[in-house]
Amino acid sequence: MTETAQMRTWAEISLDRLAHNYQTLRAMLAPDCRFLGLCKANAYGHGALQVGRKLEALGADMLAVACVDEAAELRRGGVTIPILCLGQTPPQLAELLLEHDVTQTVSDLETGRALARAAQAAGRTLKIHVKVDTGMTRLGFLWREGGERETAAAIAALCALPGLEAEGLFTHFARADEYDVSPAKTQLDRFLAFASLLEENGIHIPMKHCSNSAGLIRMQEANLDAVRAGITIYGVYPSQQVEKHIVELKPVMELKSHVSFVKKITKGTAVSYGGTFIAPKDMQLATIPVGYAD
């Protein structure tokens, strides 16, 4: 850190605390349950490469990112464990998925066909995880009551495409971090019933996962073949409604600064934009150099 930077604001990242959180969360899982550590968005601002390397060293089974560029950064930095891309990757970027050995989420048959063609043209096989939308209403093959067999047929067609290997099947909880977990349990029930329907029709996808951070902590029954741990790795609870006594997490990031200016103000003085703070008494006011760019 330069002398000038020391006079402003910085973040300190503790890989020891990251290790504590990983090990604490891992201890909640069955021995054969795989651990996917999320490194999207520069590892939630903590430094994707440093976090990815540490999670691999700790024994994480897989990492997950939002886009293929994030996966490529990890590969260039020496990460070797499997990486799942959770976002939608345009088929024209399929070469990057293959080049960096990235497993791709597929949410519709049309995209799957395009990725399969690209993989065949390269003489390669692309691993995929099939996403089922059971209630988040974002990416994923749409689950709808009465339409399960139609969706199952589309996924069967996807899994039969040469050039693709369907390694995983998953869904994402929308409300597992609320006091009332019944909406998440409804999603879990839909997913399990749909997975059974696929099996009954001869479609075997070996790795099934539902739990995000909140599900991992609060819904042990949802910790299937794997879990996807995101914000909890970094020591942050998914919401104020998640019971903190269940698991002790330690914040991985500390934001630090210096006091750059001190002044005395009198009772009733309005402070800063909009005057949103009114001094309740005569007091000293300290300013720290934290702004948009810090």
Where are these regions (language model features)?
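A charged N-terminal "starter" segment
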Residues: 1-103, 117, 125, 165
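Active-site loop/helix belt of alpha/beta enzymes
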Residues: 6, 41-58, 113, 117-118, ...
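Residue-level signal for the nucleotide or nucleotide-sugar donor/cofactor binding architecture
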Residues: 13, 107, 186
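Short, acidic/turn-prone active-site loops that include or flank metal/cofactor-
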Residues: 69, 87-91, 108-112, 132-134, ...
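Structured catalytic cores of enzymes that bind and process phosphorylated ligands/cofactors
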Residues: 99, 105-106, 142-145
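Functionally critical, mid-to-C-terminal surface segments that flank or help form catalytic/ligand
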Residues: 252-294
